[in-house]
């Protein structure tokens, strides 16, 4: 599912609002994922899963910063995500289905905080973008 020029424009328009709250939104998305899908906690054995914990904020910021880097490289996001793909596939061995779960929760967080900016077109573009990212992160799984 390739991103077209309109998708990229919608992503670039809303992303600064998300990047400026990377820690908060990333932590909220992870917290929602862990609550709704407790099986995803298995990859974080020493985490404090309480809302606003330092663990959630730290990892949430990493997630959102990686997405911000991918947004900066929308024409070739695979270059910015290659090392993360290696890490998740070969070292962490994260269930590839978890990326879709987290993507959904990121969209929920965007809707909660930016419903006024989340037009149908922007929602669709973000969904496509997160699917592209998920696909790239799972591309090295066998």
From Swiss-Prot:
Q: Which UniProt keywords apply?
A: Acetylation, Heme, Iron, Metal-binding, Oxygen transport, Transport
A single GO cellular-component term from the record reads:
blood microparticle
Chain sites annotated for binding heme b: 88
Residues modified as N-acetylalanine: 2
Tissue specificity, in the record's words, reads: Red blood cells.
Annotated SUPFAM superfamilies: Globin-like
> Any idea which positions bind O2?
59
Please name the Pfam families in this protein's record.
Globin (PF00042)
What terms describe the molecular function in GO for this protein? haptoglobin binding; heme binding; metal ion binding; organic acid binding; oxygen binding; oxygen carrier activity; peroxidase activity
Q: Which residues form the Globin domain?
A: 2-142
Task: Tell me which Gene Ontology terms the entry assigns under biological process.
Answer: hydrogen peroxide catabolic process
Q: What does this protein do?
A: The alpha-C chain is a component of adult hemoglobin C.
User: Assembly and partners?
Assistant: Heterotetramer of either two alpha-B chains or two alpha-C chains and two beta chains. The two major hemoglobins, B and C, associate upon deoxygenation to form a trimer of tetramers, BC2, that has a much lower affinity for oxygen than either component alone.
Its family?
Belongs to the globin family.
The record's annotation in PANTHER family points to: HEMOGLOBIN FAMILY MEMBER, HEMOGLOBIN SUBUNIT ALPHA
Kindly provide the name given to this protein in its UniProt entry: Hemoglobin subunit alpha-C
Source organism of this protein record:
Aquarana catesbeiana (American bullfrog)
Q: What is the lineage of its organism?
A: Eukaryota, Metazoa, Chordata, Craniata, Vertebrata
């Amino acid at each position: 599912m390739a991103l077209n020029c309109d998708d990229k424009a919608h992503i670039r328009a809303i992303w600064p609002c998300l990047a400026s709250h990377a820690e908060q939104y990333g932590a909220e998305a992870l917290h929602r994922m862990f609550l709704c899908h407790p099986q995803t906690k298995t990859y974080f054995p020493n985490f404090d899963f309480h809302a606003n914990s330092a663990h959630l904020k730290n990892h949430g910021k990493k997630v959102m910063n990686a997405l911000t880097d991918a947004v900066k490289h929308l024409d070739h996001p695979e270059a910015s995500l290659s090392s993360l793909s290696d890490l998740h596939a070969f070292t962490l061995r994260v269930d590839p289905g978890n990326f879709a779960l987290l993507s959904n929760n990121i969209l929920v967080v965007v809707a909660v905080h930016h419903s006024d900016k989340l037009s149908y077109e922007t929602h669709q573009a973000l969904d496509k973008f997160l699917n592209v990212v998920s696909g790239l992160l799972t591309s090295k799984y066998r």
